[in-house]
Amino acid sequence: GKSEEELAEFFRIFDKNADGYIDAEELAEIIRSSGEHVTDEEIEELMKDGDK
């Protein structure tokens, strides 16, 4: 698992349009760049969880 600090760092790097939000495409890129394999369905679940 990643620490919250690592995730925050990822967020800053991948929030390309700097709007404070990461879209599904950006999130998929983050996760895949960390070496994890993730499906589009998993990304959708993460996006739903992240909206809370």
Swiss-Prot record:
UniProt-listed SUPFAM superfamilies: EF-hand (SSF47473)
UniProt xrefs under InterPro entries: CALM/Myosin/TropC-like, EF-hand-dom_pair, EF_Hand_1_Ca_BS, EF_hand_dom
The keyword Lipoprotein appears for this protein: no
Ranges for domain EF-hand: 2-37, 38-52
Entry's Gene Ontology molecular function annotations: calcium ion binding
Binding of Ca(2+), residues: 15, 17, 19, 21, 26
Domain of life: Eukaryota
GO cellular component terms listed in the entry, alphabetical order: myosin II complex
Pfam families tied to this protein: EF-hand_7
Cited PANTHER family: MYOSIN LIGHT CHAIN 1, 3 (PTHR23048), TROPONIN C2, FAST SKELETAL TYPE (PTHR23048:SF57)
Function statement: Troponin is the central regulatory protein of striated muscle contraction. Tn consists of three components: Tn-I which is the inhibitor of actomyosin ATPase, Tn-T which contains the binding site for tropomyosin and Tn-C. The binding of calcium to Tn-C abolishes the inhibitory action of Tn on actin filaments.
Family (UniProt): Belongs to the troponin C family.
Leftover remarks: Skeletal muscle troponin C binds four calcium ions.
Protein name listed in UniProt: Troponin C, skeletal muscle
Organism: Protopterus dolloi (Slender lungfish)
Taxonomic placement: Eukaryota, Metazoa, Chordata, Craniata, Vertebrata
